[in-house]
Amino acid sequence: MKKVHERFLEYVKVDTKSDETTRVTPSTKGQLELGKILAEELKEIGVDEVRISDKGYVYACLKSNCDKDIPKIGFISHMDTAPDMSGKNVNPKIVENYDGKDIELGNGYTLSPSFSPELPMYKGQTLITTDGTTLLGADDKAGVAEIVTAIEYLINNPEIKHGDIKIGFTPDEEIGEGADHFDVEGFGADFAYTLDGGRIGELEYENFNAASAKVEIIGKNVHPGSAKGKMINSILVAHEFVSMLPLDEVPEKTEGYEGFSFLLDIQGEVEKTSLSFIIRDFDKEGFKNRKERFNEIAKELNKKYGEGTVTVTLKDQYMNMKEMIEPRMHIVETAEKAMKQCGIEPIKNPIRGGTDGARLSFMGLPTPNLFTGGENFHGRYEYISINSMEKAVEVILNIIKIYAEK
C-alpha cells in the first residue's frame, strides 16, 4: 500500500495550474491529465463506479460492505493549483527531523520562523517544501492523496465496516468554478467533507459571503494645454473611487470575522480605467451594505462628473455555508470527535475565503471543510508535514467508522 506522501509526490509532478482566461472546463489540460491518472488509480485499488465527466470531474464510489442503513458520505478535493504561481516542474524537498530553524529552499530562498511563526511546532517532523521556484501544490493535491490513501486502507482492511463512500475530485476550484458543473445528484452523497483546509486540526463550516465588482470609468481626454474645465482623467476618478471606500477594511488590515473590499487589479489611461475588486463579509447584512456602497459611490461620482462616467457591475460568487450546515451539525460534531480520537484538538475558525463546499452546501450537499496539513498555500513558501497528512487520513477513517457504528 502506498504511503500518503508518496502519492502526493506523484501528483505534484502534474502541472494543474488553473487559468480563468481560457473559458473552458477544465481550464487547463493538466487537470484532465491528473483526473485520468486518479481515475485509473482508483480502479486499480478496487474502487467501484469510477467515471470522469466531460468537464473533467472525477467521481467514484466505494460500495457499502454491511447491511446497516449508514449515511452515504462524500469526500471531495480539487485537482487544480492556484494561478498565483507556477506549478510546473515542481521539485519537492524532503526535510527529515526538522530542527526548528531556517530551511534553505534553494535558488536564494529561505523558509524561516520569522516569516512563518508556526514552523517550530513542526520540530522533529518530516516536512515537504518547495525548491523556491514554484508553489508546492499541497492545496489541494494533499487532500486528493489523503482521500485516495484512506480509501485504499478501507479496501485492504474489509473488517472495517462502512456505508457507501463517495469520492469527488474537481477542477478549477482556485478560479471559483469548482462547483459549476458538479453533479450533486449523480454524486449521491447525503453530505460530504472537502479536504481543502490548512493546518492540522482545522475544521471549517463558516466562510465569507463573496462577490466580485468590476468598476469601469470613462474619462474625456483633451490637450493638456487647454484641458481646464474639459478633461476628465479617468485614472484620477478611479483614485477618488478607491478613496471613498473604508480605507482600513482591506485584507492587510482585517482578520477573524472582519470583512473587506480588495482592489485586485487596475488598468487605465485618461479616457478609460477599469478596476477589479472582490467583496467579502461573513454577515449577510454587512455583505449587502458593502455592495450597496459601491453603487452609492458610483452615484456620487456620476453626479459630480456626469451620468455614465462610472459603471459598477456586481456579481455574487458564493455565500456563507453556515446557514446550510447548522441544521445538520452532526456532520461537524462527528468530525470533531474523529479528530479527538486521534489526539487532535479541533480548530474551528471561519474560512477567510471559500471552498467548493460552500457552493455545494447551497446545491443541497452540506459540505464542511477539513484540514490537509499544508501551510503557506499558493506560493514558494508552501510546505506540509507528512505527520499532518497521515493524521488527515486517520480522521477520514474515523469519520467513516463513527457513522458505521451509530
Swiss-Prot record:
Active site (catalytic residues): 80, 173
Annotated residues for binding of Zn(2+) 1: 78, 139, 196
EC number: 3.4.11.4
GO BP of this protein: peptide catabolic process; proteolysis
Keywords of this entry: Aminopeptidase, Cytoplasm, Hydrolase, Metal-binding, Metalloprotease, Protease, Zinc
UniProt xrefs under InterPro entries: ArgE/DapE_CS, Bact_exopeptidase_dim_dom, Peptidase_M20, Peptidase_M20_dimer, Peptidase_M20B
Enzymatic class: hydrolase
GO CC list: cytosol
Protein name (Swiss-Prot/TrEMBL): Peptidase T
Source organism: Clostridium perfringens (strain ATCC 13124 / DSM 756 / JCM 1290 / NCIMB 6125 / NCTC 8237 / Type A)
Gene: pepT
